Structure formats: structure tokens, C-alpha cells
């Protein structure tokens, strides 16, 4: 490969403008073709920020690798809000069910350090706490303790 470009683009809505256009402009690839393929491959993440890597050759050929959106983006999409809280320990913006937390954990499982769904859910819980999202009506900062106590084994062990 002659070069690699990494960018965070809105799923299904990439354009030839920034951040892709200025990076791809001086390369031998057709910018419109790259943008079209990125939009096709990221359509399932419509509106979410998605990491993409474009590798290209001197002959104009290219390959695109689409990553999983950041955990915060998946949480925002699942819980239905646009921005986190300015005071996440005081002002809560949304509440998620344990099933929703599990869904996000499973979506992110390839990018997380956790070795099972329970620990992946605990990582998601940490992000919920920083965004001002409660889990099952409780402060997300206590989620780890509740998982360790087995409160959610019926859902997380499935």
C-alpha cells in the first residue's frame, strides 16, 4: 500500500469535504468512489461517528476498513440522546436497561479489553457514568458493584 488515511466520519453520510477530501485529494484514488463505498459500508451506523481506514496504492486502487463507533456514540444512539451531561454525576440525561447495556457491550466486544459480556458491560457502564446515563434507574457509578454481586446474571450470562 502506498498510504493510509484514518478518519472519523458520520455513518452513511461521508462527503468529499473534510475530513476525507483534503486527505484524499493529493492521492491517486477517485475521492467520489471512496466516499460512495464508505457510505455503503457505514449505512448501518447512520449518523453515528464511525472510524474508517482507507489504504490506497499508487495505481488508484483502495481498500476500506470500517471500525465500530466509539462506545459513547453507541450509547447515545441506543438511549436516544445527542449530547452527554455537563455534570454527569448530578444531571442525568438518559436511562438504559441492562438489555441495552448488554447490546452495546456485544457491539463493542471486538474493541474492548474485556474477556466476557459481564466485563464488557462494566466497561460500557463506565462510559455511561461519564455521559450522565443511569442504568436501570441507578447511578452508573455503582453498576460494577451490582454486576459483581450477581444482580444481572440472568441477563448477562445468556
Curated annotation (Swiss-Prot):
A Pfam family per the record: Ribosomal_L11_N
Entry-linked PROSITE patterns: RIBOSOMAL_L11
GO biological process, one term: translation
Keyword annotations of the record: Ribonucleoprotein, Ribosomal protein, RNA-binding, rRNA-binding
Gene Ontology CC terms: large ribosomal subunit
Region (Disordered): 1-28
GO molecular function: large ribosomal subunit rRNA binding; structural constituent of ribosome
Oligomeric and partner information: Part of the ribosomal stalk of the 50S ribosomal subunit. Interacts with L10 and the large rRNA to form the base of the stalk. L10 forms an elongated spine to which L12 dimers bind in a sequential fashion forming a multimeric L10(L12)X complex.
Membership in a protein family: Belongs to the universal ribosomal protein uL11 family.
Functional note: Forms part of the ribosomal stalk which helps the ribosome interact with GTP-bound translation factors.
Protein name: Large ribosomal subunit protein uL11
Annotated source species: Halorubrum lacusprofundi (strain ATCC 49239 / DSM 5036 / JCM 8891 / ACAM 34)
Lineage: Archaea, Methanobacteriati, Methanobacteriota, Stenosarchaea group, Halobacteria
Gene (name only): rpl11
Amino acid at each position: 500500500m502506498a498510504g493510509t488515511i484514518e478518519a472519523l466520519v458520520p455513518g452513511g453520510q461521508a462527503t468529499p469535504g473534510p475530513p476525507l477530501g483534503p486527505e484524499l485529494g493529493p492521492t491517486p484514488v477517485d475521492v467520489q468512489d471512496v466516499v460512495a463505498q464508505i457510505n455503503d459500508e457505514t449505512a448501518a451506523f447512520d449518523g453515528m461517528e464511525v472510524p474508517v481506514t482507507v489504504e490506497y496504492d499508487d495505481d488508484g486502487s483502495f481498500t476500506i476498513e470500517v471500525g465500530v463507533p466509539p462506545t459513547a456514540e453507541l450509547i447515545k444512539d441506543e438511549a436516544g440522546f445527542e449530547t452527554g451531561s455537563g455534570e454527569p454525576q448530578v444531571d442525568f440525561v438518559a436511562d438504559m436497561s441492562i438489555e441495552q447495556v448488554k447490546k452495546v457491550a456485544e457491539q463493542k466486544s471486538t474493541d474492548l479489553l474485556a474477556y466476557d459480556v459481564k466485563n464488557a458491560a462494566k466497561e460500557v457502564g463506565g462510559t455511561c457514568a461519564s455521559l450522565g446515563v443511569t442504568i436501570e434507574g441507578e447511578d452508573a457509578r455503582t453498576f460494577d458493584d451490582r454486576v459483581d454481586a450477581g444482580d444481572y446474571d440472568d441477563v448477562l450470562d445468556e
